[in-house]
Amino acid sequence: LIDEYRRFADVILVSSASGLRWHPRTLHRLRQRCAAIVIRRNQGYDFGSWKAALHLHQHDIDQAAFLVLTNDSFWGPITPLDDLFQRLHASAADVIGLTDDLMYAPHLSSAFVAYKAKALQCQAFGHFWKTLENWPRKRDLVKQCEVGLPVQLRAAGLKLESLYTHNANGNVLHYDWKKLIEQHGFPFLKVSLLRDNPTRQPVETWPQVIGQRNPQLAASIQHQLMPKPGFQRLIQRLRRGLNRSDGKGSRAVIAPKSRR
C-alpha cells in the first residue's frame, strides 16, 4: 500500500511499534519508500500520530498543496489508486473523505481524508491540532476528533465532500463493503471487517470479490488472517485443558479469535 501511495505523494510514516528500530531490514525497506519515518509511543490513537507528524514536518506541510491523513485500517489497494487521486484533485471541495457518517453529527470518516491548501491554511485546522488532547477512550476521541474536526472546518466555511457515500449511517465499510467495491470501485477493504466482523456481516465471498480484482492482495490477506503457529499451539493447549471433564462440572471451549 505504501508503494501505491508514493506514486502520488511523499509518504511520512508514523509508527507506534518501538521494536521497529531493532529490525534494520524492515527499516531499510521503509526508508527506501518513505520521505520520513516517525516512531513514537502509542498515545492519542490515529490523531495523536498525525499531530506528531504535522508538528515535526510543519515547514513542509505549510508549503504543500495537498495533504492526506490516513491510517492502517485498510487492506489494499484492490485496484490502482489513479482514479481515486484524480477524483481527489478534481473535487471542488477543500476537505475530501472516502466515506461519511451521520453518527453524532454529519462528518467524514477519518481513515482517509485529503486536505487541500485552503484547508491547510485555515485557522480552524491549525487551532484543532495545536489544542488536541490525548483522549484515553476511543469513544471520546471519535466525538471530539473524527466528528469534531469536520464540524469545525465546515463552520469555518470550508467545503467538505465524501467521494463514495452520501449520508451513510453507521459503519458503511462493514455493512456495504461488497457494494462499494463492486458497484463504486472502492479501492480498500476494512481490516476489522475480516479480522473481527463485530456486526456479523456476510463476508464469505470476499476471496472472490478481491481475487477477481487483485489476486496478489487476496493471497496476502489470506496469509495475514492465518493464526500464527505459536498462537495455534497455545489455543490447542487451552482447549485440551479446558475441555477435560470428570463428569461433575461444566465444559468450556475456547475458540481462537483474531484481535486487531
Language-model features, listed with the residues they occupy:
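ER/Golgi luminal nucleotide-sugar-dependent glycosyltransferases, focusing on the catalytic module
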Residues: 1-260
